[in-house]
Amino acid sequence: MRARKGGGDAVTVTARHYAATLSRHGATPSGVDWESRAAQDLRFVQLLKLCNFSRAFSLNDVGCGYGALIAHLDQFHPGCRVTYSGTDLCAPMIAEARAIWAGRPATTFVNRKGCAAMADYTLASGIFNVMADCAAETWHTHIADCLSDMGAHSRLGFAVNFIAHHAPDVPGLYRAPDGMWQAHCAAIKEATVETVTGYGLREFTLLVRFSA
């Protein structure tokens, strides 16, 4: 990845970026920087390997956007009761999510960084991919803070995905150094970390599990 100097703080940069994509594309996959619903679902499938769908559970969705994960859960896991808490840095995204999912039981949305409540599991899809003009050191601090927050608000574990280091170096995108975030996550509550690859994308998913 090309070195960057200067740039804004991570929260402001991220909120501004997604406000712009939402303004251009609306509450669609393109509005949250995914190429298609299928691409979203493929990533959700990997992240949700963390969860036990044989019983009800609570779930934090960090960087929830307009709530696309809810549509995935309703389509592919309709028999499982999930208490859902979505958070996002982008206020317009939260407004869209509240409008789309108004009246859905056990569902809340909050405009904030990190988790809004304790939950059994926490997921985050693609929230570290777009660093825009942030300096690498600033972005690494942001990621570490977010992962620590996810760990602190998860009873059973959390899952997150990253663009792999061997992916093409695209300006403004963040490619994770090999092994860096696996080691970081393993140090959170002495977690067990599973790295999921081989699903057709130049990225990986971390499933971080805590001992019962």
Where are these regions (language model features)?
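Conserved glycine-rich SAM-binding loop
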Residues: 65
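Conserved alpha-helix/loop element of class I SAM-dependent methyltransferases that forms part
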Residues: 38-55, 72
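Class I SAM-dependent methyltransferase SAM/SAH-binding core
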Residues: 60, 68-108
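Class I S-adenosyl-L-methionine
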Residues: 170-212
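A short glycine-rich, Lys/Arg-flanked "PGG" loop and its adjoining helix->strand segment in the class I
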Residues: 141-156
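Conserved beta-strand signature within the Rossmann-like core of class I S-adenosyl-L-methionine
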Residues: 154-164
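A short SAM/SAH-binding and catalytic strip from SAM-dependent methyltransferases
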Residues: 121-140
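N-terminal, positively charged/glycine-rich alpha-helical extensions of SAM-dependent methyltransferases
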Residues: 1-28
